Amino acid sequence: MKESTRTSTPSSGAKPKGDREICLRPSSSVFLGDQQLYFTQEYLATNSLNMKYVVYFAACQFSGPIAVIYAAPKSWFIWIRTISGRILKRDLPCTDPVFIDWTRAHCLLVLSKNGRAQVLSSIGEKVSEVFFDNQVSDVHECRTFATSRGDSGIAVMDVDGQVAVVNSVSEPVIWSMRPPYSELPTAWTAFQPHSQLTHILLIFEAVFLMGCQGESLQVQNHASVWVDSSTKYVKCVVDDARSRIAMMTENGKIQIVSIDLSTCFCTVEVTEHEIGKCINFGWVGNSVVFVQMSSSLTVFVNVSARRKPGDEVRFMSIKMTANARISVEPDGIRLFESTRVEFVEAASREKIAVLNRSLNEDGAYLYKAAQEMEQGTGHNSFAASTVIQDMYKAIDDCISTACDTWQPEEQKLLLKAARFGMAYTNTTPDTTKLMRAIKEIRVLNELRMVRTGIPLTHRQYRIIGDTCIINRLIDMGSYSVAIKVAQWLGGENCESVDRVLLEWVRRSISKVSRSNMKMDQPALEALDEKISAKLLQFPHVSMADAARRAIEAKLPELARLFIRRETDDESHVAVLLQLNDVSAALTKAAASQRPQLIHQVVRHLMTSESRSSYELAISRIPLAQCLYQDLVRQEGETRGISSRQMLALLEQASDFERQTLFHFDVAEIERNPSERLNALRRAKDAAKSMGDKAIEEILNDVSAFAPLQIQRGQADMSVRDTIIEIADDTAKVAQLKQQARLNDKQVLLWTIEGLAKKGKMEQLFDLAQKRSPIGYAPFVKACVRYKRNEEVNKYFAKANGYSDLVAANLAKKNYVDAAKLAYDRRDREVLHAIHMKSHDDPVQCPRVKQLLNSMDQA
């Protein structure tokens, strides 16, 4: 067994930064076998953390805020701070707390002794509550666990050993599980494997019981192949990937096993320290565990799966100041001491290769070449670059290492190395990865500043993503940083900027509305000026959204001040309707000359006001009145009381054009011939009053023709249907032609169709014997339509001329023949139309398509 010591990592010679800045000194490192741990001092002079008097401590994963609970006489108080010490909430009272922890949704969970859990935001606002008090007696211990949905669950064990579980804190549904033994377990945990139910693992000395929701606890007999039954297990911790569990026995043995307890990957025994009596135990990345012996001593142990039985155990111990606390991150741990915050992480392969100048590592040679270039020794730089075998891998290693380092000077040099290597590639380099890395490093460095206090690592950043980072900044009230980050990541007009600004507006308005401040007109105008001045810097952000936030906060006068600045008419009208200021909305919609806005207001009126009220309001605006009439007509309200009211409105407004259309609609849907005729006559009178001679003449003809249709008993038939019906009576056809003022071509087409329909083939043939002014394609089409197949070829043979032949072939669905005619004429438009019609024939369509392609290629 060998203990390692820390060494300082060579830096680029940069001077230390001022107090309370990120990364005061270069990172130090230590090798634990095949693992290298990096120790980075994130912040110094963090006396405001005041760790000495802390009773309960919890740090949010992914470098989020920390929460501490202090005890005062007869009371408890919660303080929430960033890691750099900036206070987010102070002196928040709580009752009999026994446990605090952060969820992955950036919320603080405070569990009281009686089993009541409060869920708070990162600035101490109450979000929800979870009541375990009906399920458990006094709380003994508690565990939180990550879920597959990205949220957190909680498991609470009472003094009787019963476990109550909530799979998701945001949607609390409690279920419980009771072990078969009366004593409490020596170790236990809760976890949710990927795409599986929540599992509870209880260990009674060397007996392992596991169960999930809906099942009872079962003894895990298959674990006997690796369980040490001569001792008892005192700790068990699930890794961040939820695939392995680290077990610890009271005699100092650490075992790494699979999540289903079927396989033991690694066993390590530490004899230099009595680790079985530790106060904290957990993972550092994937291959190292830490054991906190006391508030001032922590041991790190290599538990890599690559260790072989009999290999020397590698560990190291570090001493810390008194009252130190540890928080676990997905890629490392964070040490909170009295005067500093330090991050411990297991280095990636790329970082080890580049920064340790490993032999035969292309990334290390490229980094050395960049350093030589920076120092002005170009010949040495060229010499270092010539030994690189895989330049693309070297570039990727330097970019990855730049993202993983903390010192800005070192980041710049590594990025320069990557850019330098691109000059030696055989193809045009793809700079996408480099540009993305520069953008992400810029964001990370901004987040790590003391004023923000989120020392996020690149690996953590990649896990939670851009949106989650911006959400966390919003939760903490860091709006200026959130806007800056959103602009860097998505550009000036990205949706994230809008979201940040509107959340700032909401919180600013809510803060004022909850206060005892008198909200008179000057105060509202001052708040309007403050918020508008900021929003107007971002033209893509709608003032209407700010007005909606004011409405939600029950400050309608403030909303009216906001909406005056809104330039989009649609948003302006929508907010006025929310304010129930209908007259202003109607005036604004009419002034915009946009019918859809007026429709929107009219519909709102029809659903919220009485008919007399909204018709009176609409009658004052002519355009609104016209659109209202359209709306009623479209909805079919043209009968009964609504019809008479509509007509009265039109007559009152002397709107003869709308009156004409109104009577047309009545005539169209009226089934009574007499009423239909009356409607047509009223339409004619309205057209006459309107002074439109053309419409008046048309209506005069229609109203004169309608009585004759009634006399013939054909009131429900159109002119076309009538001629088809009497096609074999030439006298009646001639009479109807004169009455309806039809042209010869139209009458001929309908007569052909009528004779074919009635089977009057002799009359049809006599008609065809005369020279047809419309060709013979209509004869073919009529015979095909009414299945007079024996007559089709007779008329098809008479067809002549290009258009007549094409139409006749189309009537017979001879698409290929029609296409050939069009192809010979080089008539692409007709050929394309034939191709579109041929799609219903899968045999002919490809051949027509071939002719079309041939014409396009010619």
Curated annotation (Swiss-Prot):
Q: Where in the cell does this protein reside?
A: Late endosome membrane; Lysosome membrane
Molecular function as annotated in GO: actin binding
Ranges of compositional bias, category Polar residues: 1-12
State whether keyword Transmembrane applies.
no
Query: What are the entry keywords?
Result: Endosome, Lysosome, Membrane, Protein transport, Transport
Instruction: Tell me the GO BP annotations in alphabetical order.
Output: endosomal transport; intracellular protein transport; vacuole fusion, non-autophagic
User: What Gene Ontology cellular-component terms does the record carry?
Assistant: endosome; HOPS complex; late endosome membrane; lysosomal membrane
Write out the ranges of the annotated region (Disordered): 1-20
What is this entry's stated membrane topology? Peripheral membrane protein
Q: Which family does it belong to?
A: Belongs to the VPS16 family.
Q: What PANTHER family does the entry give?
A: VACUOLAR PROTEIN SORTING VPS16, VACUOLAR PROTEIN SORTING-ASSOCIATED PROTEIN 16 HOMOLOG
- Protein function: Plays a role in vesicle-mediated protein trafficking to lysosomal compartments including the endocytic membrane transport pathways. Believed to act as a core component of the putative HOPS and CORVET endosomal tethering complexes which are proposed to be involved in the rab-5-to-rab-7 endosome conversion probably implicating sand-1, and via binding SNAREs and SNARE complexes to mediate tethering and docking events during SNARE-mediated membrane fusion.
Q: How does it assemble?
A: Probable core component of at least two putative endosomal tethering complexes, the homotypic fusion and vacuole protein sorting (HOPS) complex and the class C core vacuole/endosome tethering (CORVET) complex. Their common core is composed of the class C Vps proteins vps-11, vps-16 and vps-18, which in HOPS further associates with vps-33.1, vps-39 and vps-41 and in CORVET with vps-8 and vps-33.2.
The protein's name is: Vacuolar protein sorting-associated protein 16 homolog
Q: Which organism is it from?
A: Caenorhabditis briggsae
As recorded in Swiss-Prot or TrEMBL, the protein's gene is named vps-16
